[in-house]
Amino acid sequence: MKKTRFISLLTLLAVCAMALPGTAMAHGVWFARRSDRIQLVCGEGWKDNAYDPDGLTTIKGYDADYADVAVEPIKGEDYLYIEPSDDLAAVYLEMDYGYWSNNADGEWIPKPMDEVEGSTIGTHALKYSMNYFKPVTE
């Protein structure tokens, strides 16, 4: 009986471990240097995705002591970038990536489920990110 429980536990752990990489590869947002700019990137791993710059709902800048510092997003065609001041140490942001639903063929469409025929999975993707450019105090 103990051996059966042990095997069941190992099987459960293996199934959970296989599910984690898919979760870890979800789209995220972060700042990265692109050419001569600090650009807000939305993507997964190596892949940058185009996005609607109007999806940025909140952006807050902080210095090393977490005092507010002005940070203004600058719009590109399908991205945002910032020009950090010398005292900018961290940036918090919130982004509404919109609704996404799969269609009957499994393709992802940027619409809510009730607008996509045959959809079985949908999401309203909200992204939150804290980005550090310099060390901060505790």
Kindly label every feature range from the protein language model.
Residues M1-K2, V15, M25:
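Generic low-polarity alpha-helical segments
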Residues L10-A19:
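Bacterial N-terminal signal peptides
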Residues L20-A26:
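Sec/Tat signal peptide C-region and signal peptidase I cleavage site
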